[in-house]
Amino acid sequence: MSNSKLVNYTKLSPNHSGKRTHSIDRITPHCVVGQCSVETLGNIFMNTACEASCNYGIGYDGRVLLCVDEGNRSWCSSSNANDQRAVTIECASDTTAPYMMNLSLIHISEPTRR
């Protein structure tokens, strides 16, 4: 399985379950509740105590982090069934409800071209 060519920064998290048990058929965006950079996102998901990760992170400036290889299941949505089949994307967002994130930064067609 290949990773996105849109990645600007790589910091691989130890927080994942290894190889997926289902093929990818969906995208799950999730807000990180903060205007984080990709460097900050990478550091957050390096901490094993947080028990969280994502395949990709999108920083406040639109740069893209590779955090967990697409071939592996990340720990993003609190659903094993979903995370096994989704490309998970943590997005920088506002810090107050409704936690707006700029979804125009996500290139939705990119994962479907593979």
Where are each of the predicted segments found?
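A generic structural motif
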Residues: 92-98
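Residue-level detector of conserved catalytic or cofactor/ligand-binding positions
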Residues: 106-114
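N-terminal catalytic cores of peptidoglycan-degrading enzymes
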Residues: 1-83
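A generic signature of intrinsically disordered, low-complexity regions enriched in glycine/proline
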Residues: 19-20, 94, 106
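Soluble periplasmic/extracytoplasmic beta-strand elements of cell-envelope proteins
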Residues: 28, 88-90
